[in-house]
Amino acid sequence: YEITTRLVGSEMCIRDRIALVKGYDHNFVIDDYEAGKVQKIAEVVDEKALRSMEVYTDLPGVQLYTGNNMVPELGKGDALYPCRGGICLETQFFPNCARQEGFIKPVVTPEKPFTSTTIYKFVN
């Protein structure tokens, strides 16, 4: 799937794969990825609250997850947090990258430790 500007939830449970996991739990490829370069890869906008979150990373992928299997829970001020009541953007290498031809493979050794940068910037 290609992610462009859209309302999260507008396509939930419509496409076969999204219907299978009852929401989003998918890795997306950063098209203009450059190794070692921190760049903006996503923005989540809450138009009601007039705020947004920008995501920056130096990794080649991002997992979009919408809490598909979470049990509804009462939170602060007795607010109900329902299944799919939130969104998570997890920057990462691609799932199963060690076994896939052509995927970037992170190699970690004592001489070459893993370092990465991810920034979640909240904007009003």
Protein language model regions, located:
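Single conserved hydrophobic/aromatic residue that forms the stacking wall/gate
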Residues: 1-14
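Acidic/His-leaning functional-site neighborhoods
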Residues: 19, 23, 31-33, 37-94
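C-terminal or internal capping secondary-structure element at the end of a domain, subdomain, or sheet
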Residues: 87, 92-94, 98, 104-124
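Generic alpha-helix signal with a bias toward terminal, lower-confidence helices
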Residues: 9, 56, 65-67, 74-76, ...
